[in-house]
Each structure stands twice: as C-alpha cells, then as structure tokens.
Amino acid sequence: MSTRAGRRVAISAGSLAVLLGALDTYVVVTIMRDIMHDVGIPVNQMQRITWIVTMYLLGYIAAMPLLSRASDRFGRKLLLQVSLAGFAIGSVMTALAGQFGDFHMLIAGRTIQGVASGALLPITLALGADLWAQRNRAGVLGGIGAAQELGSVLGPLYGIFIVWLFSDWRYVFWINIPLTAIAMLMIQVSLSAHDRGDELEKVDVVGGVLLAIALGLVVIGLYNPQPDSKQVLPSYGVPVLVGGIVATVAFAVWERCARTRLIDPAGVHIRPFLSALGASVAAGAALMVTLVNVELFGQGVLGMDQTQAAGLLVWFLIALPIGAVLGGWGATKAGDRTMTFVGLLITAGGYWLISHWPVDLLNYRRSIFGLFSVPTMYADLLVAGLGLGLVIGPLSSATLRVVPTAQHGIASAAVVVARMTGMLIGVAALTAWGLYRFNQILAGLSTAVPPDATLIERAAAVADQAKRAYTMMYSDIFMITAIVCVIGALLGLLISSRKEHASEPKVPE
C-alpha cells in the first residue's frame, strides 16, 4: 500500500473509531426505558439509570488526556488498537448485562467503553497531525472533529433506529463488534508499528489521576440513591464534595508546578483559553440536560411512549448541524467572540421558553411572524438547538487560535473534555437537585379527593398530582439551564478576537 493510500486508510479508520465512540456517548438517552426494564430498575428509581451516562463520561474525560499523551510515548498504532479492543470488550459487557439483567455489569461495560472512547479522539487528531504537513492539516483535523460532532447529532436517532430494526436495544452494542474489527484491520494494514518520535514523551500520570479523582468525587457526592424532599445530597455528600474540591485544588497546584503537564502553558493565552473552555462547559451541560430531560418530559408529562418521546429530540438535533454551519459562516464575518455570545444567548432564550412548558403542552402552538404556526415544543427546541449549534465552530476555533500549533491536537481534545465535563456535572447535579425538587413539590401539592371516590379515581388524582410536580420540576431545571447559558455567553465575551494569536514558544537550538 502506498504512503498516500495508507494514510487515508488510517485516518478513515480513526475517524470511524471516533464516530463509534461519539455515537455511544449519546445513544443510550433514547433507549433508557428498555435498558431499565431489562436490568430490573423500577420507574420510580430512574436516577439509577443515569449512571450509564455519568460513568461513560467520567471514563471518557479521565482517559482522554492520559492516553493521548501515552500515544506520544508508545505509538499511535498500539494505543489505537488497544483502545478499540477495549471499546469492543465494553460493548460486549454492556450487551451481556442486558441479557443477564446485571446492572453492575452494565455500569462496568459502559465505564470501559468510556475509557476506550476517551483515547480515540485525541490519538486520531495526533495521527492526522503526524501524517499530513501543516499546510494541509486543517482539513484533516476538521474532518475528524466533524465525525465527533456527527456522533452527537446522530447518537440518539441511531439508538431509535437500531431498536426499530432489531426490536432489541442490545444490538446497539453488538453491532459495535464488527465495526470495531473493521477499524482495527484498517489500522493494522495501514500504519507502521514504529509510529512514534525518537524522543519519548513523558506522561502526566499524576495530573490525569487527580483530574479523574476530582470528577469522580463530585459525581459520587451529587448522587443521592434515596432522594426525598428534605435534602438534595446524600448523608455523605458534603464530605465527598469537599474531597472533590481538595482534589481539584491539588490538580491545579500540580499542573502549575509539575515539569510534565497535560497541556503545556508555554505560548498559551490563558484568559481566552480558559474562557473558551468555560463556555464549552456551559454548552455541554445544556446539551446533556436536553438529551436526557426532554425525553423524560415527553414520557412523564405528555404520556408518550419511548419512541414518541425520543422523536421530540429530532427537532433539536436537526437544528444543531444547521446552527453549526451558520455559526462557522458567521464567525468568519463577525468573529468567534460575537458568535459565541449571540449563540449562547439564543440558547438561553430557547431554554427560557422551554421552562414555561405547561402540562397540556400538546395543545399549544407558536405563531411565526404571523405567517403560520408550529407546535410550541418543536419551535422552542429548534431555537435551543440552533443556538447551541452556532457555538460549536467558534469555540473550537477560538481555543486553537490562542494555543501554539504544536498543541492543537491536545487543545482540540480539551474543548471536547470541557464539553463532556459540563455534560457530566450537569446531568449529575441537575438529576440530584431535580429529584429533590420533585419530592419537595409533590409534598406541597394537595389534591381534593372526595371521600367516596373509587380506587380508580384516587389513582387518577395521584397520577395528575405527579404530572403537575414533574412539570414544575422540569420548569426549574430548564430555567437553571438558561442561566448556565447566560453565564457561558458572558464567558464568550472574554475569548480571543480574530487578531489575537498564540505566541509560538522558542525552541532551543
């Protein structure tokens, strides 16, 4: 195989791997009910199923910086093959967990999948940088990034499609096995085993472990296995969260003092870099809150089945890529800062509208400039999705502009890590607070039931009360999400202008 053909095969295989990892990040949000049924989780303990999302994200975030650096030391080919093998093993465990009804195996499988997926994006980005000259590199790296973003758009729809095709959610994970095998074969025949530099890169193991510990403690501290109306956190929540804060401080101190760091700050413009990452955290939190809670609103409040509720997300997911295209074009005219600010403000407006959804939402429509009307839920989700899409390109572009060229791979990964961190903490925090708020609202509602009411009438009254409590809970969650987006928009004002670029660090002769 020629060098040119070999590198195209290699980068295609890497992009396929990135797409698989991205799909599996989001695929479970539309098949949660089926998974809950097969692993024995009752509907009134829905908070337990969020672990299949949080543990995947935690593994993803913890593995990404460590394994991307490890590929500098041990070679792209070896780390890609190991990561793909791990992804296949995690997929098998997840599918078998459904077969045996084993919740703990399910969580273990998703965690292994997350760790493996966390390595695929940065290593493939680094591989693209290795195989293409700098002048031709932007298009290649953009294609890899597009595979990641495509997964976020298609993931929920992919889950619905596979379940419709095979009538079994386990095939979502079984189908990963042949696809992973194809990617591994393509990498095996297209890459040399000696694909690392002469100088072995050091790996910041301590920094990676501290970051993983900090995020893990925060997630555990926020998770309340027995939510009620009296307290948001479990009895052990506060000391565990304090431990997470201590680990975060230790991580920051280590990264400041260590010789080997996850990201070398030399030449990086810190303020705009951190501001762009902060805005990415806000965007990630909003994205995951939408993917999880819109479907639950459809099922719990509107009485839809799983497929109908997941169909609500189609409007949001259609708007995302449209917004991404418009955001990329708009950033070339108005700049990344303006597009990020405007995009997140539009997103905040969308969530403000969603926070006002009533119990009888299906009866409401919105007038579009007096010309025609569309169902309110579709219009509001389109606004939120369009706004989030607008910031995808500008945030990545703004981050790369203030980082030296040599660190573009790890900087691109940092944007994804920031977004994933927002998703992880957002779903953990709002799930904990939302369930507390639901029980609090439910305890405060009173339903007048006649003393001579039948059992069916009493059950209907209780169901109506729960539906009202759910509506009020989701209203609060989406209002908080709108506030998070406003904070992200303000951070967007601090990102770099088009004239601000990183200074390349001097290399000693």
Swiss-Prot record:
CDD domains: MFS_MMR_MDR_like
Subcellular location: Cell inner membrane
Keywords: Cell inner membrane, Cell membrane, Membrane, Transmembrane, Transmembrane helix, Transport
Membrane topology: Multi-pass membrane protein
An annotated Gene Ontology molecular function: transmembrane transporter activity
InterPro entries named among the record's database cross-references: MFS (IPR011701), MFS_dom (IPR020846), MFS_trans_sf (IPR036259), Sugar_transporter_CS (IPR005829)
GO cellular component, one term: plasma membrane
Ranges that cross the membrane: 48-68, 78-98, 112-132, 146-166, 171-191, 203-223, 232-252, 272-292, 309-329, 339-359, 381-403, 410-430, 477-497
Keyword Nucleus annotated: no
Note: Bacterial LAM blocks host cell phagosome-lysosome fusion and is one way in which Mycobacteria evade the host immune system.
Family membership: Belongs to the major facilitator superfamily.
Function, in words: In association with lipoprotein LprG probably transports triacylglycerides (TAG) across the inner cell membrane into the periplasm; TAG probably regulates lipid metabolism and growth regulation. May be an efflux transporter and involved in maintaining correct cell wall permeability. Probably required with LprG for normal surface localization of lipoarabinomannan (LAM).
Protein's UniProt name: Probable triacylglyceride transporter ML0556
Organism for this UniProt entry: Mycobacterium leprae (strain TN)
